[in-house]
């Protein structure tokens, strides 16, 4: 994977390695994911949906795994969630019906993050990797955890219409 530094000069941003190219046009399989609001969400249903996948959020107390900053695209999950939070009304205004964050972390872990970050939308847990495996999402491992590489899916009526891997700064949002 080609890499380049960004941010304060010590973070590594991934470049498109083609590992998400197969997703455009794909129909989402019917898989129930537990949401932080207690519901079960099936991404194959519903209208215009945006799902941003992220590796993990760090706990309020504690830090990232050792070497986290050297992993391309790993740093910035909290900022990414806050960016979607800050643009939530704007996204609804252009027709987005559903917005979700997605990680392989447990629902309990995600609940703490959703509350702490004041997210107006639920986070989805794929701790069993059912959706990740079905869609062949790019994954990586660190300290015994299997994590999703950062990406954003724009889904319309269960079909992936657009995939983006570039969303690293609070001012950047995937184009609708």
Specify the residue positions occupied by each region the protein language model found:
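Chalcogenol-based redox active-site neighborhoods
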Residues: 1-176
